[in-house]
Amino acid sequence: MSNENESNNLSLSDDLNAVESTGSSKDSDVIIESAASDDSSTSEANYVPEQDNLEKMILSTGIRVGTPVKTKYMVPFIIRANPEGLYILDISKTLSRIDIAAKFISRADISKVAVTSAREYGKTPVEKFCDLTHAKYILGRFMPGTFTNPALPKYMEPQIVIVTDPQADQQAVLEATRAGVPVIAICNSDNVTSKVDLVIPANNRGRKALATVYWLLAREVLKKQGVIKTDSEMKIPIEDFETKLVEEFS
């Protein structure tokens, strides 16, 4: 049974149930070694030689490295703890959830998809994702009432809300829930996901990890929108999604 909010959109529920019943996303084009395997090996069943460098680079970003704390909500997405005591997230579930999210986003009016990040390291990834897909970004402090108070100048009625961290972006999550809008969230091992409709398990604190999640999500959305047809047509490197350290202090 999923930990996600059961009041989510029917089509999102169907996509999620289809993946969880099979254990993987049938249409996912992202091939990465199983998180349960050793880092130096790849799954023989899914191994694609030309993707080897990309796979290693993605894993090197720390995308699956969680925190020393786990919540009951995130237990299904954790495979083990490493020697440093950090919980390791299941990369196969990360990728399948990115695929589900991309399918759902591609069926929406992209101009009504709101993406938020209160976290500094999430700002550039979110902005780049929105530039490519034409979703709307909300960076920094989320103004209370943005989704619930029509009198506000920046009021909007999103069809989908994507948050970088359900804790840091809790006001956006709360208002989306009140408005009956599905919430997609990047969730670390210590997050509470009771108000999240679709969890994307991943490191949501790391600069490179967040860039990687949003790059993968952007690529899959563009493919499902028909903007690009293959992975190789995604010419923008992951590095372009990273928040540069100089930006933080400028």
Sequence positions of predicted segments:
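Glycine-rich phosphate/diphosphate-binding loops that line cofactor/substrate pockets in enzymes
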Residues: 98-111
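Glycine-rich phosphate-binding "P-loop"
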Residues: 78-98, 133
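Intrinsically disordered, compositionally biased charged tails
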Residues: 1-50, 232-250
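P-loop/Walker A NTP-binding module and the surrounding RecA-like catalytic core of P-loop NTPases
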Residues: 115-117, 186
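Long, charge-patterned amphipathic alpha-helical coiled-coil/hairpin "stalk" segments used as oligomerization
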Residues: 122, 127-210, 217-219, 225
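A charged, well-structured terminal subsegment
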Residues: 211-237, 241-244
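Short, compositionally biased "basic patch" segments
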Residues: 48-84, 118-127
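Electropositive, gly/pro-rich neighborhoods at or near active sites that engage anionic ligands
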Residues: 64-66, 88-92, 104-107
